[in-house]
Amino acid sequence: MSRYRGPRVKIIRRLGALPGLTNKTFKSKSGYINQSTSNKKVSQYRIRLEEKQKLRFHYGLTERQLLKYVRIARKAKGSTGQVLLQLLEMRLDNIIFRLGMAPTIPGARQLVNHQHILINNNTVDIPSYNCKPKDIITIKDRQKSQSIITKNLNFFQKQKIPNHLTFDLIQFKGLINQIVDRECIYLKINELLVVEYYSRQV
């Protein structure tokens, strides 16, 4: 399954706020809340499916990519669900987003693909790159790169940067202090249900 490129409002209407996908919010009219299911008993399968979809759309992943991360998380020590979230949070495109350098994860992915981003002074153009503690993230010293990111920073750094990250507004430099804690992941998600959804596939 390919990455979703359709209307984003349609997704957040169904799944709720997904800040990685879009900074838009959906306000229901006259107390409208998913009328197709409000009077029906929702199956456990559907509940798990929707949690999985939240994760996939928020981080902008294909089905194959998400399944790959679930398999890696299952082999790691610790809670599979929390390890899964840590793997996704430490992707380069997500780190750029959480630092406030891009409005959304798709926007961050575009910055990486267009080679605006440096990690430890080396150009990295792979959005899925797995960042590590002590990695230093900067931008290329060219006018276009700085102009794009300055515009984003001025608007989006009003949001609080999570504790595992630091950003120097003077030097345009981000630092990864540590692996993200569960408390710093602001997406409303039940990761256990995602793991349960994939239990038969991994």
UniProtKB/Swiss-Prot annotation:
Lineage: Eukaryota, Viridiplantae, Streptophyta, Embryophyta, Marchantiophyta
One GO location term (cellular component): small ribosomal subunit
Keyword rRNA-binding carried by entry: yes
Any one GO molecular-function label of the UniProt entry: rRNA binding
One of the GO BP terms on file: ribosomal small subunit biogenesis
Subcellular compartments: Plastid, Chloroplast
Purpose: One of the primary rRNA binding proteins, it binds directly to 16S rRNA where it nucleates assembly of the body of the 30S subunit. With S5 and S12 plays an important role in translational accuracy.
CDD domains: S4 (cd00165)
Natural source organism: Plagiochasma rupestre (Liverwort)
UniProt key word Chloroplast: yes
Signal sequence annotation: none
Chain ranges of the S4 RNA-binding domain: 90-154
Gene3D superfamilies per the UniProt record, alphabetical: Ribosomal Protein S4 Delta 41, Chain A, domain 1, RNA-binding S4 domain
Chief place of localization: plastid
Subunit (UniProt): Part of the 30S ribosomal subunit. Contacts protein S5. The interaction surface between S4 and S5 is involved in control of translational fidelity.
Designated name of the protein: Small ribosomal subunit protein uS4c
UniProt keyword terms in alphabetical order: Chloroplast, Plastid, Ribonucleoprotein, Ribosomal protein, RNA-binding, rRNA-binding
Family stated for the protein in its record: Belongs to the universal ribosomal protein uS4 family.
